[in-house]
Amino acid sequence: MPSPPEPPLHWRDCRLEPILGFPRPRELAKSLEVQGEEWIALLESGGGLQHRSRYSFLAWGRRKSSETDAIRAYEELERLADDKCRALPCRSPTFFLVSYEAVVGEEPWLSRLVGRHEWPGMTAFSPEYVVVYDHAGGRVSVCPGDTPLPAPASRKESFSAEGPTYETSRKGFEAMVADALERIRAGEAFQVVLSRVERYRVWGSLFSAYERLADANPSPYLYYARLGGRVIIGSSPELLVKLEAGRVETHPIAGTRPRGSTPIEDIELEVELLNDEKERAEHVMLVDLARNDITRVSIPGTVQVTSFMDIERYETVMHIVSRVEGVTRPSTTFVEALKALHPAGTVSGAPKPRAMEIIAELEEEARGPYAGAIGVAGSSAGEAAIVLRSAWLLDDGETLEARAGAGIVYDSKPEREYMETVQKLGSLKRALGVDMCG
């Protein structure tokens, strides 16, 4: 496949500065938070994964924004996506979050099953100011060029949390797993990804919690977003979709182990994971599902698995990751590519329609941001991560919600799947400073 062109970082109305000595993304975002800015999107790259860690974005101020229900989420995002944004990074991206339930826009029959969440089906804004950090090129582009940078924050923001004040109990989650196993063994599905929720009471600035999370668990997709009265923080490892120069890709993650306490134990767990027949079979199935999804917007014969079953390590867990790519049909928009892949099979199951039905029946409440998509959208270019290892503020302004899931297949053990959700929530709970007992 042809490589995308080297992106120009110096747009006509922007100023270009060396990255050395320029305020870091988090420093500027913290200053904006302290000053009371209502619209902020900070998308950072970390984790040392060079193929996914070149750019970080900071955007603030609101030129236009939109919030809509799940049924109209894709349609409204298509309307907002800037038609001048055709390559990444772009001068005028739309920053967005689409909920898991936005799938009802393409699968309306699901609307009778899924509930409504406090968060909208889609929320997005086009910023007044954008700063793009090119870590590989050592450059920063400030747009527009006369953008006044916020003064350094002079006060330290406090944060504290307690809880969980509510959670899906171990007994309740293991009962859900047992129910899903009966359905899988009856032939209704091959895999169902079930999640459990935890809620915490919080005080102070969530930006402080984001800083702790980003430091403790650097990932390719770190984000802090203040969208009017809504706030979300996250450290996602998984790319849902990237579209650039007529090429679309997704990076399915399936297969998890906890990190070892020593380098030797870490290697032993990696070998165990890669040789686990259940984990391998689950991963292959979800790679095939990703191939099928990408085929919906790709030229026949162009879809390829360009890397297969690599190991990526994070603070508390390691994962098996693959990469699937295709060449898109002419005039494919970013939102069309997003629709083809959302929600990912890695957070729903296979076959996807029946798995989503079972999820709705067993979880009994809307997921909201969890397993949705967050990122930047243009007309024919964009990039979005799956909302994982994340927490979002509810409408009362003092309750933070988080979810984690596990893929259930025919030989799953309920207690093991519960512990996987505990491990996945580990970094987030440490950042919040709440009880880690599982």
Curated annotation (Swiss-Prot):
Enzyme class (EC, first level): lyase
Amino-acid positions noted as binding chorismate in the UniProt annotation, renumbered to this chain: 255-256, 370, 389, 405-407
Binding site for Mg(2+): 282, 420
Cofactor annotation comment: Binds 1 Mg(2+) ion per subunit.
Reaction(s) catalysed (UniProt annotation): chorismate + L-glutamine = anthranilate + pyruvate + L-glutamate + H(+)
Keyword Metal-binding: yes
Gene3D superfamilies: Anthranilate synthase
EC number: 4.1.3.27
The protein's annotated pathway: Amino-acid biosynthesis; L-tryptophan biosynthesis; L-tryptophan from chorismate: step 1/5
Entry's Gene Ontology molecular function annotations: anthranilate synthase activity; metal ion binding
Protein keywords: Amino-acid biosynthesis, Aromatic amino acid biosynthesis, Lyase, Magnesium, Metal-binding, Tryptophan biosynthesis
Activity control note: Feedback inhibited by tryptophan.
Residues engaged in binding L-tryptophan: 45, 220-222
GO biological process: L-tryptophan biosynthetic process
Cofactor(s) this protein requires: Mg(2+)
Family recorded in the similarity comment: Belongs to the anthranilate synthase component I family.
Protein function: Part of a heterotetrameric complex that catalyzes the two-step biosynthesis of anthranilate, an intermediate in the biosynthesis of L-tryptophan. In the first step, the glutamine-binding beta subunit (TrpG) of anthranilate synthase (AS) provides the glutamine amidotransferase activity which generates ammonia as a substrate that, along with chorismate, is used in the second step, catalyzed by the large alpha subunit of AS (TrpE) to produce anthranilate. In the absence of TrpG, TrpE can synthesize anthranilate directly from chorismate and high concentrations of ammonia.
Quaternary organization: Heterotetramer consisting of two non-identical subunits: a beta subunit (TrpG) and a large alpha subunit (TrpE).
Record-given protein name: Anthranilate synthase component 1
Origin species: Aeropyrum pernix (strain ATCC 700893 / DSM 11879 / JCM 9820 / NBRC 100138 / K1)
